[in-house]
Amino acid sequence: MIVAHGRGVHPDAGLINPLRSQLSEQGYATLSVQMPVLAAEVPGEPYLPLFPEAAERLRVAVAFLRGNGLKGIAIVSHSMGSRMTNYFLNHPGDARIDAWVAIGLSGEFTDPATFKAPVFDLYGERDYAAVLDSAAKRAAAIRSIRGSGQMQVAGADHFFAGMENELVRRVKQFLDSRLQP
């Protein structure tokens, strides 16, 4: 499983740590990728030119895991990491994955017809407005992708603060149901 963090942070920050560590303890091999970052206070739009670099990092991560014999590769991404993963999935080349968990994705899925794997769109009831306002469009975009779904977690904010165990439980349920052991 590849983990992609959000903007302005590192591969073990915030909710990434419990995802990476708890899912590893529960049998998932995890690879947390350092995504391209700008200063923490930089808003999302200046990140757009970095998306090709992010896609290359994800491509290399997929190739690394496949090269080491892993099957059933998923990407679990948060926030800006989800936007970068969406870009990657629009330009997959030979780096096919088997499932994608997009946590706190703002805006819409771009070109979901290019997605070849089930998508789990997971967000909090108290998430950012950009995430909440586009939830219906995201649900409609993945409706035709077999095995995909969307879930709003009651009480959760964008970072699942204080609800990390619930986040891990939901992600694990999806991965367990979509990836072959």
Where are these regions (language model features)?
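Serine-hydrolase catalytic machinery in alpha/beta-hydrolase-like enzymes
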Residues: M1-R66
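Short hydrophobic segments within beta-strands
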Residues: V3-A4, V76, I103, L122
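Residue-level signal for short, function-critical loop segments
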Residues: R7, S79, E125
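Short, conserved active-site loop motifs that form the nucleotide-linked donor/cofactor pocket
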Residues: Y28, I73, G147-G149
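Primarily recognizes the serine-hydrolase "nucleophile elbow" in alpha/beta-hydrolase
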Residues: A63-A117
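The feature captures the conserved acid-bearing segment of alpha/beta-hydrolase catalytic domains
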Residues: D98-F160
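C-terminal catalytic histidine-bearing segment of alpha/beta-hydrolase fold enzymes
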Residues: S148-P181
